[in-house]
Curated annotation (Swiss-Prot):
Keywords: Host cytoplasm, Viral RNA replication. Pfam families: Pneumo_M2. Changing Y46C: In strain: ATCC51908. This is Protein M2-2. GO terms for cellular component: host cell cytoplasm. Mediates the regulatory switch from transcription to RNA replication. Acts late in infection by inhibiting viral transcription and up-regulating RNA replication. Inhibition of transcription by protein M2-2 requires phosphorylation of the phosphoprotein. It comes from the Viruses. The keyword Calcium does not apply.
Amino acid sequence: MNNSNIIIFPEKYPCSISSLLIKDENDVFVLSHQNVLDCLQFQYPYNMYSQNHMLDDIYWTSQELIEDVLKILHLSGISINKYVIYVLVL
């Protein structure tokens, strides 16, 4: 993955993202659990949540977790090439 890492802690599945810590040499960015859900709210099929009920939680398998972390980074405009990504899960 081009000079970057995605580190999942603790590595257990299914899991829910507690937060993402995105770090380079100078900065650290944090996306909270709610930030993650907000980023992904409309990325999932309509039948996963009702129109009047916002997405409360998502439980990921290992492959889904990596794919969605990459989506979140892309939606946030974060270049995967220069960061280490720490995924803290519940």
